[in-house]
């Protein structure tokens, strides 16, 4: 079966649990139509490059699937009809990469803290101590 990667953007006013519920919903749609979801990631709330339906932010979800094209078409159709989903992107890939997606790797790099090659950080002065 062909391999696919899907990115879903849901409305910003959903809770995290509701956004993760959408991932489970679309995973079951793929499974019910003869495919399987290999991996899924919830990327969290991110700022959009431009407004979509008057929203500046959205919940991002990432799915890797191994499914026939009919299952993917049905999942996309239901996602486009769903009120909470603003955008869907599906890409066919030759193989799934092991490990976390590039977006998750970038987030992990940002959360590592200070870089060791920069030396020690100076203490910040208060604005009142300018003299």
Swiss-Prot record:
GN (gene name): rpsF
Where are the stretches annotated Disordered? 92-131
Can you cite an annotated GO cellular component? cytosolic small ribosomal subunit
* Keywords, sorted A to Z: Ribonucleoprotein, Ribosomal protein, RNA-binding, rRNA-binding
One Pfam family name from the record?
Answer: Ribosomal_S6
Q: Which SUPFAM superfamilies match?
A: Ribosomal protein S6 (SSF54995)
Query: What does the record give as the function of this protein?
Result: Binds together with bS18 to 16S ribosomal RNA.
Recorded family membership: Belongs to the bacterial ribosomal protein bS6 family.
**A GO BP entry:** translation
- What GO molecular function annotation could you give as one example from this UniProt entry? small ribosomal subunit rRNA binding
NCBIfam families reported in the protein's UniProt record: S6
Q: What CDD domains does UniProt report for this protein, alphabetically?
A: bS6 (cd00473)
Official protein name in the record: Small ribosomal subunit protein bS6
Q: What species is this protein from?
A: Paracoccus denitrificans (strain Pd 1222)
The family database entries (InterPro entries) matched by this protein are listed as: Ribosomal_bS6, Ribosomal_bS6_sf, Ribosomal_S6_plastid/chlpt, Transl_elong_EF1B/ribsomal_bS6
């Amino acid at each position: 079966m062909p391999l696919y990667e899907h990115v879903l953007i849901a409305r910003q006013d959903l809770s995290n649990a509701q956004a993760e519920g959408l991932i489970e919903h679309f995973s079951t749609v793929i499974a019910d139509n003869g495919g399987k979801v290999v991996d899924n990631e919830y990327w969290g709330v991110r700022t959009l490059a431009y407004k979509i339906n008057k929203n500046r932010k959205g919940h991002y979800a990432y799915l890797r699937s191994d499914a026939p094209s009919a299952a993917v078409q049905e999942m996309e159709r239901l996602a486009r009809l769903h009120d909470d989903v603003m955008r869907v992107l599906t890409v066919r890939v030759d193989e799934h990469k092991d490990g976390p997606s590039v977006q998750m790797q970038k987030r992990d790099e940002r959360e590592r803290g200070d870089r060791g090659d920069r030396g020690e950080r100076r203490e910040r002065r208060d604005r009142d101590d300018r003299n």
